[in-house]
């Protein structure tokens, strides 16, 4: 397989929405087929504050082979303090992109200036309108009996210019304070992600955002942002994640260029082909790790309590050797190193994986001794975002191999099909996700056996349903999401198996609470357990998966009154 395709597959399988137009279901091509852009107004409909659920079950199981009754997971399989919740991120759901003092983000800028780089030409100016509908969202979470809600804080909503000098936006503080208070009043624990890919555009223009070559300005500005969050929300929030999916963020923003700010090497297809896809992802990743270490150090010195936790969330695609050869086993290990170890090993032991250092060489920055000391052990919980797995097939390490993207440094292609021609698991909706719950168990065993079995939360897990202009998804079909329900049930059941094997996994968050803006896939994929009708003021409807989670969560719990302030 060509190096570019191998890297594209590695990227495309890392996160929802990054996705079908990068690689086909059989790994047959690397292409970017954009649909005709929608009207700019279509992505700016004002959503109202209505709340709707469907009380009656509709349809059948649509031919999906479900688990037998005895195999369906039950809440009492898990410890009473095991956390079940749902997850979102600020840019994907909030909307209100320029309201109440919010500054412009890199994604606002990217979508407004390069709509051709979004599959349907849309943007998240309105998103799912959660800025105005957060009370409805909390009501939904409570209705489903969720223990927790994972959401992110928009950096430019809090600091419009991204810096201390630019000032704090009091309306941004008020919004998140209101959300956190309402969650707690309803018995829902907030899990807060400080950064989920929305960089203040002012910092992009000032020093290149996370490409800051000084490795200083971005670290200082991010640490100040984290401090503002700790100062204003730390009395209520016990669980913090400094960064979400740094591997996806860096590789897609500065490698393939399909994420804001859209940079890649000359000759590749992106908005700004003036970068270096073999270097810039590593530069940005290095800055992320330095910023994480400083934020955790600050937190531990001034805000930490006995009942608080802090870490970061990794995106992990499971790996299985393509064949039985020693070379394919080595390819699997290199793939784990760049997919997981790139950001995990520095926070565990203070430095990058040995394979990455030997293969990327001078392209991978070096940590100073004092930086290694701050990095090592800079967490007391970790998040894992798991969706699917791939077969890792060896690419010979030789002078004839010319990497194109940073992920080519794994010297391994990521294959959907094994040597027998069969896929790693059943296809799920969009082409990049194949259901393979065993990969989640493999990952948890790696965390147990190799990395000391830290407290783990599955901070994202789910599938997307394709909904495009050419292949629209009827609302009834979207609500009857039995494939998603089966996927969720099987992965929750796998968590029980992993706990029985000694895993320290302590929670599970479905991705996502709501159908939302899926980055460069726009609104062409629906990942929500709750349907958002963008043609009807963003009215919410619980899908079958949400209804089952409601039954699951409330089976062994006393009901509580839903508190929703006027």
Curated annotation (Swiss-Prot):
Transit peptide endpoints, chain numbering: 1-54
Source organism superkingdom: Eukaryota
GO molecular function, one term: cellulose 1,4-beta-cellobiosidase activity
Residues reported to bind a beta-D-glucoside: 92, 196, 244-245, 387, 460, 511, 518-519, 527
Effect recorded for residue 463 to D: Loss of activity due to impaired dimerization
Residues in coiled coil: none
Disulfide bonds: 264-270
One cellular component (GO) term of this entry: chloroplast
Enzyme Commission number: 3.2.1.182, 3.2.1.21
Catalytic EC class: hydrolase
Reactions mediated catalytically: Hydrolysis of terminal, non-reducing beta-D-glucosyl residues with release of beta-D-glucose; DIMBOA beta-D-glucoside + H2O = DIMBOA + D-glucose; DIBOA beta-D-glucoside + H2O = DIBOA + D-glucose
Complex formation: Homo- and heterodimer.
Protein name (Swiss-Prot/TrEMBL): 4-hydroxy-7-methoxy-3-oxo-3,4-dihydro-2H-1,4-benzoxazin-2-yl glucoside beta-D-glucosidase 1, chloroplastic
Species for this entry: Zea mays
Lineage: Eukaryota, Viridiplantae, Streptophyta, Embryophyta, Tracheophyta
């Amino acid at each position: 397989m060509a190096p570019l395709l191998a890297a594209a597959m590695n990227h495309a399988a890392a996160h929802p929405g990054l996705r079908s137009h990068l690689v086909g279901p059989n790994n047959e091509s690397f292409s970017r087929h954009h649909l005709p852009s929608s009207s700019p107004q279509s992505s700016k409909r004002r959503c109202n504050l209505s709340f709707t659920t469907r009380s009656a079950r509709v349809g059948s199981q649509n031919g999906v082979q479900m688990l037998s009754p005895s195999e369906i997971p039950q809440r009492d399989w898990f410890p009473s303090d095991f956390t079940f919740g749902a997850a979102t991120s600020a840019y994907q759901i909030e909307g209100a992109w320029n309201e109440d003092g919010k500054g412009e983000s890199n994604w606002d800028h990217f979508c407004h200036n390069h709509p051709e780089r979004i599959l349907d030409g849309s943007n998240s100016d309105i998103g799912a309108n959660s800025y105005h509908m957060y009370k409805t969202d909390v009501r939904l979470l409570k209705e489903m009996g969720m223990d927790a809600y994972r959401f992110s804080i928009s950096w430019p909503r809090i600091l419009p210019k991204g810096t201390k000098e630019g000032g704090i936006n009091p309306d941004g503080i008020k919004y998140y304070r209101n959300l956190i208070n309402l969650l707690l009043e309803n018995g829902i624990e907030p899990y807060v992600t400080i950064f989920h890919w929305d960089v203040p555009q002012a910092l992009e223009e000032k020093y290149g955002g996370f490409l800051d070559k000084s490795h200083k300005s971005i670290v200082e500005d991010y640490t100040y942002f984290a401090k503002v969050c700790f100062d204003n929300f730390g009395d209520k929030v016990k669980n913090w994640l400094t960064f979400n999916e740094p591997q996806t963020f860096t590789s897609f923003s500065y490698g393939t260029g399909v994420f804001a700010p859209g940079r890649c090497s000359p000759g590749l297809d992106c908005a700004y082909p003036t970068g270096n896809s073999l270097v810039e992802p590593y530069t940005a990743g290095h800055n992320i790790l330095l910023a994480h270490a400083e934020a955790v150090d600050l937190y531990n010195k001034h805000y930490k309590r006995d009942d608080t936790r802090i870490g970061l969330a990794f995106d992990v695609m499971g790996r299985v050797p393509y064949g039985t050869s020693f070379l394919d086993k080595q390819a699997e290990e290199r793939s784990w190193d760049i997919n997981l170890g790139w950001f995990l090993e520095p926070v565990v032991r203070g430095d990058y994986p040995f394979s990455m250092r030997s293969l990327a060489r001078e392209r991978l920055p070096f940590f100073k001794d004092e930086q290694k000391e701050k990095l090592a052990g800079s967490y007391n919980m970790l998040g894992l975002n798991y969706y699917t797995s791939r077969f890792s097939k060896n690419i010979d390490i030789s002078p004839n191999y010319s990497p194109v993207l940073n992920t080519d440094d794994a010297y391994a292609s990521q294959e959907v099909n094994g040597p027998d021609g069969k896929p790693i698991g059943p296809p799920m909706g969009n082409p990049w996700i194949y259901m393979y719950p065993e990969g989640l168990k493999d990952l948890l065993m790696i965390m147990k056996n190799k990395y000391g079995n830290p407290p783990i939360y599955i901070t994202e897990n789910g599938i997307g349903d394709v909904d495009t202009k050419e292949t629209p998804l009827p609302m009834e079909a979207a609500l009857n999401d039995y494939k998603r329900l089966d996927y969720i049930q099987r992965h929750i059941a796998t968590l029980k198996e992993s706990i029985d094997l000694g895993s320290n996994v302590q929670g599970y968050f479905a991705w996502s609470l709501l159908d939302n803006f899926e980055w460069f896939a726009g609104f062409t994929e629906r990942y929500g357990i709750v349907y958002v009708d963008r043609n009807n003021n963003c009215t919410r409807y619980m899908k079958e998966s949400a209804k089952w989670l409601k039954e699951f969560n409330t089976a062994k719990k006393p009901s509580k009154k839903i508190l929703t302030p006027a």
